[in-house]
Amino acid sequence: MRLLVNNKKAKYNYELLDKYEAGISLSGNEVKSLALHHGKLDDSYVIIRKNEAYLLNLLIPKYKFDTSKVLNETRTRKLLLHKSEILKIDLIKKQHSLVIIPYQIYFVNNKIKVSIYLARPKKRYDKRQTIKEREINKKIRKY
């Protein structure tokens, strides 16, 4: 597994619950751009429409050696999941009022995969608690 892009804000803003791995439909130039570690997952999210999963707001900048037509850098991209997985994710999401966020994009056996999580947004006091715990752990490691 070779990590390409990571969502740095995910652990701070969300409580991550269930993990799923999905393929992603990309053009060749987008793959080349991601292979150079260009991309941003910070504001992206997953929606389920008509029993298909889509990744929105994933920023993949234009590959610098690309001479073809310009695609929208934040276009909607289809996620490749089994229908049973999509139905299961959608059911859990609706029952527990969760969101689906992408956490990482990585290579596995020359295929680009996206790890998505069912997550619960953190409240402001939860974020403060996370910061306090992190500072305490730093002090403990220091001594």
From Swiss-Prot:
Superkingdom of source: Bacteria
GO MF annotation terms: RNA binding
Record key words, sorted: Cytoplasm, RNA-binding
Gene3D superfamilies documented for this protein: 2.40.280.10
Any one Gene Ontology cellular component term annotated for this protein: cytosol
SUPFAM superfamilies to which the protein is assigned, alphabetical: Small protein B (SmpB)
GO biological process, one term: trans-translation
Pfam families (UniProt xref): SmpB
Subcellular location as annotated: Cytoplasm
Transmembrane segments: none
Disulfide bridge positions per record: none
InterPro entries xrefs: SmpB, SsrA-bd_prot, SsrA-bd_prot_CS
Family the UniProt entry places it in: Belongs to the SmpB family.
Described purpose of this protein according to its UniProt entry: Required for rescue of stalled ribosomes mediated by trans-translation. Binds to transfer-messenger RNA (tmRNA), required for stable association of tmRNA with ribosomes. tmRNA and SmpB together mimic tRNA shape, replacing the anticodon stem-loop with SmpB. tmRNA is encoded by the ssrA gene; the 2 termini fold to resemble tRNA(Ala) and it encodes a 'tag peptide', a short internal open reading frame. During trans-translation Ala-aminoacylated tmRNA acts like a tRNA, entering the A-site of stalled ribosomes, displacing the stalled mRNA.
Designated name of the protein: SsrA-binding protein
